[in-house]
Amino acid sequence: MSLNPDLAAYLQLVEAGRSAGKVLPMHALEADEARRQFEESSALIAGKADEPDCISDLSLTTRDGHTLPVRLYRPPQDDPALAGAALLYLHGGGYVVGSLDSHDTLCWNLAQDAGVPVIAVGYRLAPQWRFPTASDDALDAWRWLVEQAEALGIDAQRLAVVGDSVGGSLATILANQLAAQRELAAPRLQVMIYPVTDASCRRPSVQRYGSGYLLEAQTLEWFYQQYATVPADRLDPRFSPLLGSVASNSAPALMLIAECDPLHDQGVAYARHLEQAGVAVQLAVIPGVTHDFMRMGSIIEEADEGLVMVVEALQQHL
């Protein structure tokens, strides 16, 4: 399958900038500069949410006393069939880049199209905060959401967790932790959008799509190195969920995978891993697109198609 032509044209522009020395690959940058450039490119490919009256900035306190930013997106019109339902969103960015702002449009579109509130959390980033900080922050965010549900007008029994890239990793790690611990209300649905599930090895799709398809193999490795405190961290299920056991009562899963993504093979492998544990899985491989396609609504139609799949899964399970 060939690349979507509009996406291919965008990648040609990216490559032209690199060849001219105007843009460096992310793995050649310091973390702060990588974040700045990621935010700039996010504004170009995704745009900006246009309903500020429906968006509120909040905060939560983690187990170690750190304050995390939270953004609440309320839909302009609720879906009566999903009264009280909501979702926690965990953004992507390799544990190093990404923010509430970089995923603002995607979260707003989810809230608007699904007709449910979306709560996005800005977990701490590497290398300043290394493994397992991000997964701890995700669990703390879930606890906060459950505890604040009534005050927010949300039903803690009608929640989903959604994330893209490493946010998808955090989403499934969280869903599995909650299913195993049985301490807090667990999500009714976990949605993983091109997640990282195995940082321990290189699968064939890394060779096929690790250069020239937006997410570079060298950048992926750089992300892993920035987040891991020691190399063995990459074998921990909170880093590589494919390497851990799965609770059979984990939430049903929707997984969206890009065909032309170095993470393709590990995503497919993780879907099978969940199925073998008895978890219901809907796997969709989107042809002709790369990693991060869900944030490319200003470039390709597949972003909207993926959004429809997520909304339909929310309607089915919540």
Curated annotation (Swiss-Prot):
- Indicate whether Cytoplasm appears among the record's keywords: yes
Q: Which residues form the active site?
A: S165, D261, H291
Q: How is its activity regulated?
A: Inhibited by the serine protease inhibitor phenylmethylsulfonyl fluoride, the histidine reagent diethylpyrocarbonate and two sulfhydryl reagents, mercuric chloride and naphthol AS-D chloroacetate. Not inhibited by EDTA.
Regions annotated as coiled coil:
none
* EC number(s) per entry: 3.1.1.113
Temperature-related behavior of activity: Optimum temperature is between 35 and 45 degrees Celsius, with maximal activity near 40 degrees Celsius with alpha-naphthyl acetate as substrate.
What are the entry keywords?
Cytoplasm, Hydrolase
Q: Name one GO molecular function term.
A: hydrolase activity
Q: Does the keyword Electron transport apply?
A: no
Give the pH dependence: Optimum pH is 7.5 with alpha-naphthyl acetate as substrate.
Record field: catalytic activity: ethyl acetate + H2O = ethanol + acetate + H(+)
Ranges annotated as spanning the membrane: none
Name the Gene3D superfamilies for this protein.
alpha/beta hydrolase (3.40.50.1820)
Gene Ontology cellular component annotations, sorted alphabetically: cytoplasm
Q: What are its applications? A: Ethyl acetate is an undesirable coproduct produced in ethanolic fermentation broths during the fermentation of sugars to ethanol. EstZ could be used to effectively reduce the level of ethyl acetate in ethanol beers produced with the ethanologenic E.coli strain KO11.
Where does the record place it? Cytoplasm
Its biological purpose is as follows: Esterase that catalyzes the hydrolysis of ethyl acetate. Can also use propyl acetate and the chromogenic substrates alpha-naphthyl acetate, alpha-naphthyl propionate, alpha-naphthyl caproate and 4-nitrophenyl acetate, with a preference for short-chain aliphatic esters. Highest activity is obtained in vitro with propyl acetate, followed by ethyl acetate. In vivo, could be involved in pyoverdine biosynthesis, but its specific role and its in vivo substrate have not been identified.
Q: Quaternary form?
A: Monomer.
Family note: Belongs to the 'GDXG' lipolytic enzyme family.
What protein name applies here?
Answer: Ethyl acetate hydrolase
Classification from the root reads: Bacteria, Pseudomonadati, Pseudomonadota, Gammaproteobacteria, Pseudomonadales
List the gene name: estZ
